[in-house]
């Protein structure tokens, strides 16, 4: 586009590759700097090439509020900032909102960097992604904080060139299908875990270079691993050298003070109704999709973007007298529309905790157009249940079964995320009831239930081997736990469970309707046993039975819809996983008997605090 067209589309909220115009660009042997600061009294470029404030480079402003200057002295790798004279006369140093790289902390300067035009070698993956999509594919996500998965020999966070050598083989070995990273965009404080951003196009220096991350993604794709990233378009860090009140007025944030300030997180909220902000944010999302070949974006804190009263501070109703943030609603629909028009097989996932807005319904039906949303209700209910003494679980059995009332209202991801293993909530293993043996048994049971329940899957790092302590953002995982036999067996169990999930289409082929689910018994409160069948579109099925008390149940009998010879294909109490069973249940033939609405029954021993999953080895005539 011409500069005139760039400015016009930016102003109407339709410039979706804003980084091609704003920011710093190599042009005819010089570097051109452009920044949007419509109400600034003056803007200058300062940096290594101006001896910082000693020889500032004056910028000129156009009618759209964009300031521009060219430098013959600037070189790639130089540090720079904008010296902004705000409306009112205050002079502040600001980052470049469009910078693609920033200096190593504690510095906050932007870096002049020309991104390489990578010749990608992941064509097989990208072609398969386009051909097969993802809705009817297995999705089992390993959630990672790149700075604390594993430290290098000097105790520093690994860069992505190092993670390529260590994390990718681990993902492959553990049979995950995708890896999701907590924010990789530039952020000044590790304590925020990356969720208070300052650079929406800048790769976080701590983790290496943009080129290293490109190579990491390519290597993941070559190993059949998809890559997702977290992205935070609702709020941003309020540091004075970042986006906050960039030109002295509400530039990126709302003009209304209470709407601008996020009291819960000590951040500032984007003005999602402002056209220029829409161009900025949608350009950021597309940049990560296109430049890094990522396979999906998880949008953080969607509820904060949808509801005016979600925050802890004062709020005002909209023009209709209710609590909906109409600008947020329309922005999210626009975001998903733009991305799906260009990249229909990139996953858009919402972290959203309410049930009043249709998150994954299509745009034509009035939904927001996301592909998936995290099932926060299921997660809260199920963790509360598994923490409870089994003696009382029969009275709270609805915590396990309630999800079947709404499971297909949205397309869900069943997430045990980082949020559940911090701030005194305890690690996944430590949440479980009982002594050490029963804690591991409960965790195996829980993970089997997650895998068999409709919905895509996500597990935070460290939870796969039963790390005992909570996650600490400034330390690596407790890999030393794997010196313990029980943790080793827990890791082996998760690895085999992940492969079990991939191998059985019944668990992922139909995740969005009762065509893939048949409830056998959700009323057995007295024994606290839940049973259901998962089905695929070819007629195959798995019978899934969960004993949620530490009482073994010999000759447990259940109705089944298909006569046949059944084989146990998963038993969470096997000795190799840390249990006490040396052998599986024997292959078992159904009996002709009436059980509820079924004409055939299957009898077997149900392990204490265990899950037992069966497949039909041979069908018999009814």
Curated annotation (Swiss-Prot):
> Which GO BP terms apply?
glycogen biosynthetic process
Q: Which reaction does it catalyse?
A: Transfers a segment of a (1->4)-alpha-D-glucan chain to a primary hydroxy group in a similar glucan chain
- Keyword rRNA processing in the entry? The reply is no
Q: Provide the Gene Ontology terms for cellular component.
A: cytosol
UniProt KW keywords: Carbohydrate metabolism, Glycogen biosynthesis, Glycogen metabolism, Glycosyltransferase, Transferase
Q: Which InterPro entries match?
A: A-amylase/branching_C, Branching_enzy, GlgB, GlgB_N_E_set_prok, Glyco_hydro_13_cat_dom, Glyco_hydro_13_N, Glyco_hydro_b, Glycoside_hydrolase_SF
The regions listed as transmembrane in this protein's record are none
Pathway terms, separated by semicolons: Glycan biosynthesis; glycogen biosynthesis
Enzyme category, top tier = transferase
What GO molecular functions are on record for this protein? 1,4-alpha-glucan branching enzyme activity; cation binding; hydrolase activity, hydrolyzing O-glycosyl compounds
Q: Where is the active site?
A: 300, 351
EC no.? Answer: 2.4.1.18
Could you confirm whether the keyword Transport appears in this record? no
The family assignment reads: Belongs to the glycosyl hydrolase 13 family. GlgB subfamily.
Assembly and partners are described as: Monomer.
Q: NCBIfam families, alphabetically?
A: branching_enzym, PRK05402.1, PRK12313.1
- Job description of the protein: Catalyzes the formation of the alpha-1,6-glucosidic linkages in glycogen by scission of a 1,4-alpha-linked oligosaccharide from growing alpha-1,4-glucan chains and the subsequent attachment of the oligosaccharide to the alpha-1,6 position.
Name used for this protein in its record: 1,4-alpha-glucan branching enzyme GlgB
- Which species is listed as the source? Streptococcus agalactiae serotype V (strain ATCC BAA-611 / 2603 V/R)
